[in-house]
């Protein structure tokens, strides 16, 4: 993969999900399930709009001692969740990756 992209797929529950992948192909943000494809598209547009604003990221610690974050829209609803990171620094690097990749990421509908 030579460019970042939003990979949209349908889950076993027939809902639509997206994963934002970086240039290296690693997933850096995952969505909730959407009942409709248009809802998923709206979620992607919200990620593109809100990803550059550091106030929209909420940093969290897991019970297992790992770090992750959620990206929130202006209305405070969660629009994406990161993977788990072993260090806080790695988590911050994940945020930086989303900031630099989300706006230019293309949408790829998976089969």
Regions found by a protein language model. Give the residues of each.
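Short secondary-structure junctions
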Residues: 1, 48-53
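Glycine-rich beta-strand-turn "strand-cap" elements at beta-sheet edges
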Residues: 99-111
């Amino acid at each position: 993969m030579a460019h970042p992209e939003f990979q949209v797929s349908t889950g076993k529950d027939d809902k639509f999900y997206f994963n934002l992948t970086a240039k290296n192909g690693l997933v850096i943000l995952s969505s909730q399930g959407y009942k409709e494809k248009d809802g998923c598209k709206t979620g992607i547009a919200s990620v593109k709009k809100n990803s550059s604003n550091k106030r929209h990221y909420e940093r969290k610690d897991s019970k297992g001692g790992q770090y992750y974050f959620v990206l929130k829209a202006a209305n405070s609803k969660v629009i994406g969740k990161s993977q788990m990171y072993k260090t806080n620094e790695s988590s911050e690097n994940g945020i930086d990756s989303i900031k630099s990749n989300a706006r230019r990421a293309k949408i790829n509908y998976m089969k």
